[in-house]
From Swiss-Prot:
Omega-N-methylarginine modification, residue list: 147
Biased segments, Basic and acidic residues type: 105-115, 268-277
GO terms for cellular component: nucleus
Protein name as catalogued: Arginine/serine-rich protein 1
Taxonomic source organism: Rattus norvegicus
Membership in a protein family: Belongs to the RSRP family.
Amino acid sequence: MSSAAVSKYVNDMWPGSPQEKASPSTSGSGRSSRLSSRSRSRSSSRSSRPHSRSSSRSSSRSHSRPRRSRRSRSRSRSRRRHQRKYRRYSRSYSRSRSRSRGHRYYRDSRYEQPRRYYQSPSPYRSRSRSRSRGRSHHRRSYYAITRGRRYYGFGRTVYPEDRPRWRERSRTRSRSRSRTPFRLSEKDRMELLEIAKANAAKALGTANFDLPASLRAKEASQGAVSCSGPKTEHSEKQTEVGTKNASEKSAAAQRNIAFSSNNSVAKPLEKTTKAAVEETSSGSPKIDKKKSPYGLWIPV
């Protein structure tokens, strides 16, 4: 290409050239360049407007963000407060020499200053505190007996073997005060025998039954002792024995036990028609103390 053509091309491309004013073709190209520049400025302004809007929105968001952070902070604070309520009971105990005196220093999780409380050290709680995993609470001691020694807690302190007191107390309570066995006197035994007789007569409906040989021997020995005793007791026992014998005879005469092969249960005989008529006419059966054994029961 020649230098004239190059210069013409450059002048055509340049917007403020004198050839552009002279020639109409150059004026058309200038208008197109102006329109393109205007569209570029408009597009740049349009592009700048959203940027400004986005910047304003971002600024407003940045201004509104602290509010949300405040809310989150308040929520986190409330959660921490709830956690502190539960942490009140978990206190980290500081090791000090005041244990022997019965005092314990422990630091509350809410306050930094240590507080002093007077508490008596209980023997059932271990003196070893667990500081691992952030848990600071009392762990109850367990007894591990090895070679005559007892380890409290996690084996940090060793104590000599000692018997627990509650076992000794239970043994002393279970033992009776008097080491001699409980024995009944002969009088008490005879009273119990009479009560047993009365119960048997009530259950069977008759007082005519044979006693075993051991009880007969006891009755005979009791009669001999009563004869050697004072006269008043002897007379009272004789009257009691006489009334008992009379009542036994009358009961045997009134009610006799009937046994049969068909019926194995002992039942008294049925009453006569005369006795039944007397009972119905009187309305209520009359109990004679001398004839019936029920009037001679001994009160217990």
